[in-house]
């Protein structure tokens, strides 16, 4: 007899790739004009020089304050201009790199604002990849194999008319990302960053809402959807099971709440491509997503 349950699947986003198994994905969005596969578009950001100076000041490296500016996207499809976008640095250790990564928000200063269906744009400098190809190759491979992965393209970045170099334009993983791929888009999704090691912190879900000492603005387990409910019980259940289940019961208890097969498939690909910033090595960033699935006695179908 089949019944609806809730289980955590893995959507990882880090230095190289993102994905989980194809059975969980119900829709595959087209690349569209925001993620051109066969040309390099230009992104031009313009903001007050004093605001840019604040963003680039090393003392403000970990600030997530957004500053107003103008976004211009130039490609063979035409030129789009969006005023009153939010601009800030993004990333973790990359914030201290010479080549910064940036986030552009279309809905910070304009409620409901979007560009080509996107609320955010991630412009990654990929400072540790001289080829500027690793991330795109792996993400495109993941998409071709049916894994859930963000759309991606290369762009030229200009800030206040100064050329900043070739950048990777990576689709932002948020509620919009989920809605484009799942019928059930109401699940909870957490952005987990270092030191999120899935350690058992007890029965109180509030214990998992802590922030690291170096960044009081962002929780280590940051709920990215359903923020008003702020329900951390699923993260608590996962950490509690990982930390306390006996050897005899571990497999059964974990599979009841977590897509083990999908995680192992993804981990195999991450090891193959040398992705170091993941849970099996150095947990830099990962995204567990709680989503409904159907389960029977003889099969599990996401």
Predicted regions and their residues:
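Bacterial N-terminal signal peptides that target proteins for export
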Residues: 1-10
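Bacterial N-terminal signal peptides
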Residues: 9-19
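Phosphate/dinucleotide-binding and metal-coordinating scaffold of catalytic cores
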Residues: 24-302
């Amino acid at each position: 007899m089949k019944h609806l349950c809730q289980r955590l699947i893995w959507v990882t986003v880090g230095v190289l790739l993102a994905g989980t198994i194809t059975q969980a994905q119900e829709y595959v969005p087209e690349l569209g004009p925001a993620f051109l596969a066969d040309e390099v578009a230009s992104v031009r950001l313009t903001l007050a020089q004093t605001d840019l100076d604040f963003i680039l000041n090393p003392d403000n490296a970990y600030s997530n304050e957004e500053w107003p500016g103008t976004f211009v996207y130039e490609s063979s499809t035409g030129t789009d201009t969006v005023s009153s976008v939010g601009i800030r640095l993004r990333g973790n250790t990359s914030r201290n790199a010479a080549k910064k990564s940036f986030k552009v928000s279309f809905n910070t200063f304009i409620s409901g604002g979007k560009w080509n269906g996107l609320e955010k744009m991630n412009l990654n400098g990929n400072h540790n990849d001289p080829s500027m190809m690793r991330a795109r190759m792996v993400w495109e491979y993941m998409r071709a194999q049916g894994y859930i992965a963000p759309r991606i393209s290369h762009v030229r970045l200009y800030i206040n008319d100064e050329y900043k170099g070739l950048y990777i334009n990576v689709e932002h993983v948020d509620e919009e990302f989920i809605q484009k791929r799942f019928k059930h888009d109401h699940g909870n999704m957490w952005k987990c960053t270092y030191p999120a090691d899935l350690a058992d912190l007890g029965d109180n879900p509030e214990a998992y809402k802590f922030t690291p000492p170096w960044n009081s603005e962002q929780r280590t387990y940051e709920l990215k959807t359903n923020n008003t409910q702020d329900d951390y019980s699923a993260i608590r259940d996962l950490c509690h099971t990982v930390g306390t289940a006996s050897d005899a019961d571990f497999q059964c208890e974990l599979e009841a709440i977590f897509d083990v097969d999908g995680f192992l498939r993804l981990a195999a690909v991450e090891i193959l491509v040398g992705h170091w910033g993941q849970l099996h090595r150095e947990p830099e960033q990962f995204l567990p997503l709680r989503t409904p699935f159907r389960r029977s006695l003889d099969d599990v179908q996401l």
